[in-house]
Amino acid sequence: MKGIPKRPISNYIEKTNETNLYKIRKGLVNEMNVEGHIYVNEKLKTLLDEEIATYELNKNSTFLPAVMQIANVSTLPGIVKASIALPDVHAGYGFSIGNVAAFDMDNEKAIVSPGGVGFDINCGVRLIRTNLFYEDIKPKQEELTQLLFNHIPVGVGSQGFILCNQENLDDALCLGMDWCVKEGYSWIEDKLNCEDNGRSLYADSNFVSIRAKKRGITQMGTLGAGNHYAEIQIVDQIYDKKSAKLMGIEKKNQVCIMIHSGSRGLGHQIATDALIDMEKSMNKYKINVIDKQLACTPIHSKEGQNYLKAMGSACNFAWINRSSMTFLARQAFSKIFNQSPDDLDMHVIYDVSHNIAKIEEHYIDGKIKKLLVHRKGSTRAFPPFHPLVPLDYQYCGQPILIGGTMGTYSYVLTGNEKAMQATFGSTCHGAGRALSRNKSRNTLSYLDVLNKLKEQNISIRVASPKLIMEEAPESYKNVCDVVQTCHDAGISNKCFRLKPVAVIKG
């Protein structure tokens, strides 16, 4: 590991005049091309300071705090403006989770890095509205929760309900949600309110390894484990009535379904394959990275293009996953309430990605530049009238879906112009872990967590009991602080808040 700072890390971090914005000055690590920008309030900064203090007690540890990772990313070839950390930031593989970094497509040395996307490619969130209210589901809450748990395949080894062969899988990996529409799992209008219309145009299944396909072929339409979930939620607060109305949300206690899932084993294998290829190719392109977890290759190289094509395929797989679970959720609600999903107004409000790299146009130094924007644990936040925002939301900006934890709030935000200027049109993605999974298991009580959920009248079904502690609210930062930090900084606007009444986990 190179680049251990000679002076205390805090010496390189300074508060700016802008609300909730700190800067990491050049010099924290060698050869920083740009500054680091961190969006945190005082409370969240304390968590980062604690992470730094732990690291400085043992600098020979393999653990790197998020602040160091943000600085390390700033050394990568072709990066522009800043390496950006959002308030839910925490240490990850190479790039921290909650990091945004953009690379100039016109710079032949500019890179793409799988660590800047993550292993769960296109891990993301979908929100489905209904015309039901809490009083409609309360008498049937346990029955509905159990039926959803029975319908949606969950857990590490779960297998999907979609019977898929190699030919079908290749077709699906190339078409994304268009495949779901063709097969009858999605409504046509679903894809219109989905980031990129639910289809990555980079995708080419020929660049997905046989091993990755074998892992994916049985997992299509599954939730998975870890922090993935399906929740029945109710609207708790409405902050922006006009924007909420455009999304079909008009009253408190309206029932929604939130699905958080990704590309499962297929995406993980694609990331693993790419990291191996890039570690081998860095010598060829004379790239030296400060941390081997930042393995990368020039965007326009053969290896870079191969990764983008495979990554696009994983993105499509993830959109199919969320689409097929939408199909199952609609079936479950239809069965319990004896009405069609259409009669229940079970329309997709939006579907966003939290782990992705995409070619976008942004202003840099007054000029429009084509950039490869890496968002890892962050959400696109485009403003009103942006051409990539769906027609339904042209007047309010892109909906931004922020998942909380199984005992706390989730949020819907909207994008704005400040984000385009400050963060490449990006904002936070969730609460962000505060405790490691091991620490959660060792310090939290299974029964205590269950009792707290019961006190809040939250129904829960979980395939693996250890996940109760790992995913407990105490394991995460306060999502309200995270969202408010972004709102106060002006990089996203609060629209409405949801609270869970039923949680299904792997």
From Swiss-Prot:
InterPro entries: RtcB, RtcB-like_sf, RtcB_euk
Residues that, per the record, bind GMP: 227-231, 354-355, 403-406, 410, 429-432, 505
Keyword match NADP: no
Keywords per UniProt: GTP-binding, Ligase, Manganese, Metal-binding, Nucleotide-binding, tRNA processing
UniProt-annotated binding residues for Mn(2+) 1: D120, C123, H228
GO annotation (BP), single: tRNA splicing, via endonucleolytic cleavage and ligation
UniProt function note: Catalytic subunit of the tRNA-splicing ligase complex that acts by directly joining spliced tRNA halves to mature-sized tRNAs by incorporating the precursor-derived splice junction phosphate into the mature tRNA as a canonical 3',5'-phosphodiester. May act as an RNA ligase with broad substrate specificity, and may function toward other RNAs.
Name of the molecule in the record: RNA-splicing ligase RtcB homolog
Organism expressing this protein natively: Plasmodium falciparum (isolate 3D7)
Gene coding for it: RTCB
